A protein has these predicted regions:
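N-terminal capping segments
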Residues: 131-181
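Catalytic cores of secreted/periplasmic lytic hydrolases that degrade extracellular macromolecules
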Residues: 1-133
Length: 181
């Protein structure tokens, strides 16, 4: 992987800054579904899907369970080894990475690329792309740890929640409240 910012943005968006039930209880920070080849543990949860642009619906689907954060991040990189994601190799531009992974079927939201790019720009995540050639799952894990668990005391709390709630349809169908933390 030659670009880390879109991966960090995906984790932020998919996990609600590491605070979603899927992230907190099951260490699945990327919203990874089981698919047909998954042999590990799983949990059935409600989720939003957008099969027709602009029309979201709630479905129930099986998501992967990981034992810890490290395994959850490694799970993302293992998913990228599937043949359908091989076209991501060598991409150095965040927008192109996101457009490609979206077109490959990673997400159904018609605004998925836009939401992730807004996170990349607002939080200057491209600084993690410098010299990203050869980055590992551990590098992305280190970035994620620095973003997970914001609290009201650090001044980003309300800004993060407001940004998260501004994206429709809401991930997992839930608008985060300031009092949730």
């Amino acid at each position: 992987i030659k670009v880390c910012s879109p991966i960090s943005a995906q984790a932020i968006l998919e996990s609600g800054w590491g605070e979603s039930r899927l992230a907190k209880d099951y260490h699945n920070y990327f919203g990874l579904k089981c698919g047909t080849k998954w042999q590990g543990k799983s949990v059935n949860l409600a989720t939003w899907e957008e099969y027709e642009a602009g029309t979201a619906m709630v479905i129930s689907d099986y998501f992967r369970i990981f034992d810890n954060m490290e395994e959850g991040v490694k799970g993302y990189f293992e998913l990228l080894q599937l043949p359908r994601y091989q076209n991501l190799k060598g991409i150095t531009e965040p927008g192109r990475y996101l457009e490609t992974i979206w077109a490959d079927g990673y997400a159904t939201s018609s605004v998925y690329v836009q939401k992730n790019m807004e996170l990349i720009e607002q939080y200057q995540l491209m600084k993690y792309d410098e010299n990203a050639s050869g980055r590992s799952a551990q590098d992305v894990l280190n970035v994620m740890r620095s973003w997970i668990g914001y609290s009201e005391a650090n001044g980003k709390f309300r800004q993060i929640i407001d940004l998260y709630n501004s994206y429709l349809p809401l991930a997992r169908g839930y608008a985060v409240q300031y009092t949730d933390f």
